[in-house]
């Protein structure tokens, strides 16, 4: 029941260009990335990153790295022109357990929003959910000061689930049943005032308006869109970031 349209592109990604009379090239690491499609019986049950503004909800981190927060190959490491010593990895049994957890949560309609933790780590995952839902977010990290960067920017496998407060216990019980009891933690709640606040027990890291952060996040894409697409349309889309309506 699964269709795989392509799987070879990631095995041969290479780009070549001329710079100052010399040929330059970048060849991507050889790693198989497969895209797949499956039938969807009811599009109304599809999980998206669009955060609900309901304050009687919680955001739960399902951390398949189980707190290791390895930074190798992360965007943050590359920003500092490093690769890191230890890269994230996964345990096969945990992937199966994660699938079972999410499937049961979805079947029971416990999940309001879902986003995988990927490029940029946990902080970017949370911000993208807030941006999509046009709402604020209160993030509380239970880590020491020397662990903050790793917790926010590690790209360990995992996901963030938004669930109604009344179903948090259900998710935790299900996680324990599939062997992920120590991998699920409550990480954040929505804010109605549109502010993004990130705290640790020791100090406040971020306190900013959602739209201010989203304008920074979208700045590069906006600049590209003005060149590639219709500039007026790109400007209109960029200006709409300040609006509170998340759209369809």
Task: Name each model-derived stretch.
Residues 3-153, 165-248:
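Intein/HINT protein-splicing elements and their conserved insertion hotspots or analogous self-processing inserts
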Residues 160-164:
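Short hydrophobic/aromatic beta-strand micro-patches
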Residues 156-158:
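Short, solvent-exposed beta-strand edge segments and adjacent coil->beta transition regions
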């Amino acid at each position: 029941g699964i269709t795989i349209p392509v799987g070879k592109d990631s095995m041969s990604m290479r780009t070549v260009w001329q710079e100052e009379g010399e040929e330059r090239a970048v060849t991507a690491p050889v790693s198989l990335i497969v895209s797949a499609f499956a039938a969807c019986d009811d599009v109304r049950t599809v999980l998206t990153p669009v955060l609900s503004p309901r304050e009687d909800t919680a955001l739960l981190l399902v951390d398949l790295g189980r707190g290791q927060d390895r930074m190798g190959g992360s965007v943050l490491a590359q920003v500092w022109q490093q690769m890191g010593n230890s890269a994230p990895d996964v345990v096969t049994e945990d992937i199966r357990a994660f699938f079972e957890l999410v499937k049961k949560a979805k079947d029971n309609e416990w999940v309001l929003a879902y986003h995988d933790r990927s490029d940029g780590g946990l902080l970017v995952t949370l911000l993208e959910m807030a941006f999509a839902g046009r709402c604020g977010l209160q993030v509380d990290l239970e880590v020491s000061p020397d662990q903050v960067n790793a917790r926010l920017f590690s790209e360990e496998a995992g996901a963030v689930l938004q669930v109604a407060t009344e179903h948090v216990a259900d998710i935790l019980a299900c996680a324990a049943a599939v062997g992920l009891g120590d991998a699920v933690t409550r990480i954040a709640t929505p804010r109605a005032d549109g502010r993004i606040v990130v705290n640790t027990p020791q100090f406040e890291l971020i306190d900013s308006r959602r739209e201010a952060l989203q304008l920074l996040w979208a700045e590069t894409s906006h600049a590209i869109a003005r060149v590639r697409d219709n500039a007026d349309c790109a400007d209109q889309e960029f200006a709409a970031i300040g609006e509170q309506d998340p759209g369809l």
